[in-house]
Amino acid sequence: MSSEWNSPVPHPDTPAVRTPHEVLTCYYQAMLDKSPDDLADLYAVDAVHEFPFTSPGFPPRYEGREAVRAGYRAAWGASPAQVQEVRRIAAYETTDPEVIIAEHVVVGTLTTKATTFTVPGLLILHVHNGLITRVRDYMDGSGVPSAGA
């Protein structure tokens, strides 16, 4: 008897586990859509999202999927900044298959003033079983002009 008969067959309704590259693509799409729900749904329940370069009024980290959801809902909901494009500079694989490092530039507009801005960034994503477990998000939030400036 062949060993293939003993291998488990996934149920047709079972979603495929996303690779780190696929998670990164979904992450960028959530940014473009300004969707805190789509973003948070990429995270494990106990994930941590860190901002090593903090900006005034912005927390240094979110702990847990629901904190990510609430934090981005508040930040994106209050901001007149609209992301127009995420320019993907590079994505680097590491010796750890669950880690991807991505360079990008966010291009957007401040809808209250029609001001264009660009903000370079770097993400280090840890993805386990298709969900983000940790993010180190190196973005200089001061690159986004304020609504009143």
Write out the residue ranges for each language-model feature.
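Short beta-strand edge/turn micro-motifs at domain boundaries
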Residues: 2-5, 118-146
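A solvent-exposed, acidic/Ser-Thr-rich amphipathic alpha-helical stretch
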Residues: 36-93, 98
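A short, structured loop/turn motif at beta-sheet edges
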Residues: 91-99, 126-133
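Hydrophobic/aromatic beta-strand elements that line small-molecule binding cavities or substrate pockets
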Residues: 86-91, 106, 120-126
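Short, low-complexity N-terminal intrinsically disordered segments enriched in polar/charged residues
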Residues: 1-45, 146-149
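Generic short beta-strand segments
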Residues: 103-109
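Short, solvent-exposed loop/turn segments at secondary-structure boundaries
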Residues: 60-62, 112-115
